[in-house]
Amino acid sequence: MTPLSPSAPLPRRGRRPPSPLDRQLPELLAPAGDRDKLAQAIHYGADAVYLGGSRYSLRANAGNFSDQELREAVMLAHGAGVRVYVALNIFAHQRDFAGLDDYLLFLREIAADGLIIADPGILAVARRVVPQMPIHLSTQANVTNPESAAFWQACGVSRINPARELSLTELAKMRERVTTELEIFVHGALCISYSGRCFLSLHLTGRDANRGDCAHPCRYRYRLEEERRPGQFFPIEEDDRGSYIFNAKDLCLLNRLPQLIRAGADALKIEGRMKSLFYVGTVVRLYRAALDFWRERCLDAPLPPEFAEELSKIGGRGQSENFFSGPPGPEDMQPGGAASNPDWAPAAIVREGGGSPLVEARNPFQKGETIEYLGQGLKNYPCRIIAIHDQNGRELERANPNSLLRLTLTTADNEPLDCRPPGLFRRQTMAPPTNPN
C-alpha cells in the first residue's frame, strides 16, 4: 500500500478545513474557454486553469478572452486561489511577432502564472522579454523522449506537457531524466494526428489547425467512392451514417491516476476549451473528487462505483486509455463516430444561491419535474420543482432556455439544499429502465 508522500496541500478555496490526512497531489488543470467555463472550473475544484487570449492561442474559436477579460479572469481565479496559464501555442509565422513583446509584458503585468508555448521562436522572445515568467511547453512541441525533455529544460522551460503518444513507462523514464514539471493529459478528445499537429483541416477547408482554427474534419462523416462508379458511395463500415475512419475515442485515465502520481506527474490536464461549460463542470468535479478520495486514503484504494456511474452521465465518444499501456488498437477507434448524447443534459446554472435559487435555464424543464443539483464532491441532490417564477413574479409551467427564473424546490429526503453560484442542475433526458417484475 503506497501512501502519498507528505507535503503542504494545495490551496483548497475553502471547500473544507485541512485534514490531517491531506497530502500533496498533482495539480488539477482545467480548460477555461470563456468566463462561464472559468467559473465552472473554479467552482468544482480546479487548482489551475488554462485559457487563451485574442492572439497566439491554438483555439481561435473557443470564445477566448480580450485583454480586459484576461485581467478580470486572473483576478477572479487568484481570488479563489487558482492559478492561470495563458496559451501562446500557435506555430508562428513572421507576421505573428509584431506586438508579441507588448503582449508578453501585458501578461506579466496582470500576473498570469505561466505561458503555454510550442514555437521555439515565441519561447526565445518570452525568455528575453519576461525571463521571470514560467514557460510551459505545449504538447504540440511533441516531446517524446527523455533527451528531448532535457533539451527543453536546458532552454529554460519549467514544465513540459509531453506528447500524448507516450506510455506510462516512457513517462516514468522522462521523469527520471529531468527535474522540470511534467503535465499529463488525462481526459478529453484525442486528435488522430501526432499530438495535434494536423494539416487535414488546412487541406480540406483552408482553416489551419496549427494556428488555432481547426475545422475538426476528423469528425466528418466519410464515404468511399470508386473512380469508375461516380455517385456510388460505399461505406467503409456497414453503417448508414457513413464511416468515422479518423475518429478516436475520448481519453479517460480516471482509474490510472494513482499510477501517474507514482510516476511523478506534477499536473493532470483536462482537454476541452471548446467544450460546453456543463462538460467542464462535470469533468472537473469528477477528477477533483477522485483526487480527494485518494488524498485521504492510499493510492491502492479502488474508486467506489459512484465514480463510474458519474462518468457515464457525462457522455462523449466512448473512452480509451490511448497509449497509456502501449500503442492503442482498433478497439480505441469509435466505429459509430458521433459523440453520444448522454442520458443527462444541463438544466440550469445557479446565478443566485439559497433554497430557492435564481437560475439561468439552459434546456427546457417543467413544473413537477425532478432535476439534480451537482454539489461539490460527488454529492448529488435530486430536487422536485414545486414552482417556477420569472423575474416579474409570474408563475410558469415550463422553463425556456436562456431565461432567468426563480425555482421553488424540494429535495427527495427534505435535506436542505445549499445551492451556490455557478453550480449546475441537470435533468434526465431518458427515463431509466423499469423493472418488469
Where are each of the predicted segments found?
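Gly/Gly-Pro- and Ser/Thr-rich, intrinsically disordered tail segments characteristic of DNA damage-repair
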Residues: A98, Q132-M133, L137-T144
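Surface-exposed amphipathic alpha-helical tracts and adjacent flexible/coil segments at the periphery
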Residues: T2-I42, A48-Y50, R55, V74, ...
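Alpha-helix capping/helix-boundary segments
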Residues: G121-I122
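Alpha-helix C-terminal capping segments
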Residues: I42-G45, R127-V129
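N-terminal glycine-rich flavin-associated loop
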Residues: I117
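Glycine-rich, positively charged N-terminal anion/phosphate-binding segment
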Residues: R59-L76
